[in-house]
């Protein structure tokens, strides 16, 4: 299951989605999330799913690849859906003890599950098509107005980028430690839930040691390359908006407008 966690991975490519300015993709993700929270009908969620499928096709990312990243989140998705299932109003369809299932509760549960799945897949699509360096530059440019109040924008952007990039690294390290302990007789897949949780405790110490070691090595490497954030730092490739970015932003605005219209008319 650890290998199914794909957040933070980057798949190089030359598609139109890969070539978009990272600021455009970040703004697009925000617009997509806003549209998801505006969606209140099956038609709206179908539209948002169609948008995601279209973008993944343009990026040459198979829907199967996007959905594979949801496997580690299945428990959270199901739990959230069940919680929303019992908090609907209206005439109960099924009732037992203090719990009741209504048509509105089923609708809310389906919408919540769809919202989480589409939101996570949209975030995956951003990381799949944007390198950590591009994300750092994009975040720094977007947050640059905060420099007026002496906010450490470059440091924040670098910190977020490194954190995102370290996710697959830590997952790989965890998988190696688990394999080494399994070779010594440890079991992580058998027994009751409490026993499985206890079996994971011995993983924490070597994982933290590995994480701190990697962080120290990264800091040393950055210092050796004379890295410094803030004013005076240059880039090999400066960010520039192109015509395709304008088209993408217009498309984002149209998606929000379409979902807003569907919400207004109850479709």
Spans of model-derived segments:
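Transmembrane alpha-helix interface motif
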Residues: 1-44, 48-57, 144, 148-151, ...
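Alpha-helical transmembrane segments and their helix-start/interface "positive-inside/aromatic belt" motifs
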Residues: 25, 64-74, 245-248
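Transmembrane helix-loop junctions in multipass membrane proteins, especially transporters and channels
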Residues: 41, 45, 60-64, 88-96, ...
């Amino acid at each position: 299951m650890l290998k199914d966690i794909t957040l933070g991975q980057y798949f190089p490519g030359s598609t139109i989605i890969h070539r978009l300015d990272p600021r455009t993709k970040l703004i697009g993700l925000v617009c997509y999330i806003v549209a998801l929270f505006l969606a209140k009908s099956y038609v709206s969620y179908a539209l948002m799913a169609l948008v995601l499928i279209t973008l993944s096709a343009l990026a040459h990312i198979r829907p199967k690849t996007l959905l594979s990243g949801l496997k580690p989140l299945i428990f959270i998705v199901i739990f959230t859906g069940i919680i929303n299932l019992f908090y609907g109003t209206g005439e109960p369809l099924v009732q037992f003890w203090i719990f009741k299932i209504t048509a509105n509760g089923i609708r809310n549960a389906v919408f919540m599950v769809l919202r989480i799945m589409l939101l996570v897949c949209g975030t995956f699509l951003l990381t799949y098509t944007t390198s950590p360096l591009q994300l750092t530059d994009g975040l720094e440019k977007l947050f640059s107005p905060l420099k007026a109040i002496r906010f450490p924008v470059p440091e924040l952007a670098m910190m977020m980028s490194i954190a995102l990039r370290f996710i697959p690294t830590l997952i790989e390290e965890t998988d190696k430690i688990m394999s080494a302990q399994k070779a010594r007789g440890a079991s992580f897949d058998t027994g009751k839930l409490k026993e499985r949780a206890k079996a994971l405790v011995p993983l924490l110490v070597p994982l933290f040691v590995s994480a701190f070691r990697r962080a120290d090595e990264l800091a040393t490497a950055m210092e050796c390359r004379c890295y410094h954030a803030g004013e005076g730092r240059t880039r090999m490739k400066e960010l520039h908006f192109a015509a395709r970015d304008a088209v993408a932003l217009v498309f984002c605005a149209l998606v929000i407008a379409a979902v807003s219209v569907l919400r207004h008319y109850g479709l």
